[in-house]
Amino acid sequence: MSWQTYVDDHLLCEIEGNHLTHAAILGQDGSVWAKSASFPQFKPEEITGIMNDFNEPGTLAPTGLYIGGTKYMVIQGEPGSVIRGKKGPGGVTVKKTNLALVIGIYDEPMTPGQCNMIVERLGDYLIEQGL
């Protein structure tokens, strides 16, 4: 299965009539493995900030989580495993696997819990596969 299939079928799936707005799977170096068509362009320093927060949880909280220049307020995540951000009626979930970052961006009417479930479920599956 290609990485794009994981994005198209597992991240952009429908859940209770809702879909993620954007989704991507990136290498931990920031290389794009697969993404939705309109996923924002990451800046190298944004990937560095995310990886630093996974290695030293809490480092993003004072400055915010940036994806494609958009700032998200960091909210409760799972240290070293999941970073969650909120911006207005939407937000983002970033799940770290052994080799990758699984990212989902949502907007209303999707809920934070729905986004978390989709992103973390795929991330957990990839971890089980050694990825």
Swiss-Prot record:
InterPro entries assigned: PFN (IPR048278), PFN_euk (IPR005455), PFN_sf (IPR036140), Profilin_CS (IPR027310)
GO cellular component: cell cortex; cytoskeleton
Gene Ontology MF terms in the entry: actin monomer binding
UniProt entry tagged with the keyword Cytoplasm: yes
Keyword Glycoprotein on entry: no
Keywords: Actin-binding, Cytoplasm, Cytoskeleton
Tissues in which the protein is found: Cytoplasmic distribution in hypocotyls. In root nodules, it is found in all cells, but is more abundant in the vascular tissue as well as the endodermis.
Cited CDD domains: PROF
Localization of this protein: Cytoplasm, Cytoskeleton
Taxonomy, superkingdom: Eukaryota
PANTHER family: PROFILIN, PROFILIN-2
Assembly, per entry: Occurs in many kinds of cells as a complex with monomeric actin in a 1:1 ratio.
Family per similarity comment: Belongs to the profilin family.
Name of the featured protein: Profilin-1
Source organism of the structure: Phaseolus vulgaris
